[in-house]
């Protein structure tokens, strides 16, 4: 996907970390600024990532914006805004995720699946979406970024019959709907993890409370002023 004919770009240095500008197309002269915003966010979130992992996150952002029109990946086109609202927003859940194999349903452009796969190369990640074009993008970017732990699948959740230790989603407006479609894909001792703006409502707790144990984690996403929560649900009677 990269365009090697583009003019040379300014390199980005973060302390003793150097981000090689080779291969970047859309980020251009903003690369140093974006690299520093990312590094500061990683530090604030308490995540340990190598220089290569940080570069890979920025390459993903670059390709997301480059191929956005062709694949209809995101409504956000400004690189700084996309970095904060997509990449850093997903980074905020990394330290809170239970261990084990992971399925991300309704993954869209691969959020949070690709971000998790970059940060946790030891974890097996499956990105599931019924949109063929978006899965083609994830397949291509996973190959280019060397994400051997990523498996993109174009399918509806109802037709996917594998069980996972962790099932995530960033796409569902309703927590109840997410639980309904995700539960059949969850291993017995597994966890459902929903990225949400607000904490669970009283109605959601009432409907789900008999069968599910709730853990609500308030997320502090660097540079994002919107309310963000990770809702973790596990079976009460296992």
From Swiss-Prot:
Catalytic activity entry: guanosine(527) in 16S rRNA + S-adenosyl-L-methionine = N(7)-methylguanosine(527) in 16S rRNA + S-adenosyl-L-homocysteine
A Gene Ontology term for the protein's cellular component: cytosol
HAMAP family: 16SrRNA_methyltr_G
Family: Belongs to the methyltransferase superfamily. RNA methyltransferase RsmG family.
Localization per record: Cytoplasm
PANTHER family for this protein: S-ADENOSYL-L-METHIONINE-DEPENDENT METHYLTRANSFERASES SUPERFAMILY PROTEIN
Residues that hold S-adenosyl-L-methionine according to the record: 106, 111, 157-158, 170
Function of the molecule: Specifically methylates the N7 position of guanine in position 527 of 16S rRNA.
GO molecular function, one term: rRNA (guanine-N7-)-methyltransferase activity
Protein name as it appears in the record: Ribosomal RNA small subunit methyltransferase G
Name of the gene this protein is made from: rsmG
SUPFAM superfamilies, alphabetized: S-adenosyl-L-methionine-dependent methyltransferases (SSF53335)
Keyword rRNA processing: yes
UniProt keyword Transferase present: yes
Superkingdom of origin: Bacteria
Taxonomic path: Bacteria, Pseudomonadati, Pseudomonadota, Gammaproteobacteria, Moraxellales
Enzyme Commission identifier(s): 2.1.1.170
Keywords: Cytoplasm, Methyltransferase, rRNA processing, S-adenosyl-L-methionine, Transferase
